[in-house]
Amino acid sequence: WFIGIDGSFAPWVGSVINDINQKIAIICPEGREEEVVKRLARVGYDNTVGYLKGSFSTWKKEGREVGVVIQETAPELAEKHSKTQNILDVRKPGEFAAEHIENAQNQPLDDVFNSLKELDTEKRYHVHCAGGYRSVIFISILKSKGYNKLIDVKGGYQALRREDIPKTDFTCQTTQKEGG
């Protein structure tokens, strides 16, 4: 799975890697290996088995299989948007409740393994979060489980909200009452 070092790394490691004893191999930019090991250890993940010397470029040079995440821009999605498209919003429920694309499904990243039960491996899904970090993690996990028709929406909801695409009305979550 891919969890980017330059985002909210530690919280997402804790959310998506359920087994604290999981063996972890690191692929990161050269020179940042020690940083990743320390950041993993700070949140209790001490089972790092090693790192790929030379980073991702070594993997590619050796001709090993590389997974890719297909991206579309928000304008590209808006241009072809229809109510029949499958749009997955992987933001937290409160973010989704505040405002979202009409007919989007909320499948929060921190609940990704339950999403496996609800999604069809044969369907194409456009996936977004707020800005693009969480959606790539979500996609990398699903791709490892056989979901290959996933498209990341570049720029996430921040980019989508500027497009002429049907959205729910904004509701400030700090003023919304429990149960209402």
Residue map of PLM features:
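Rhodanese-like catalytic fold shared by cysteine-dependent sulfurtransferases
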Residues: W1-G180
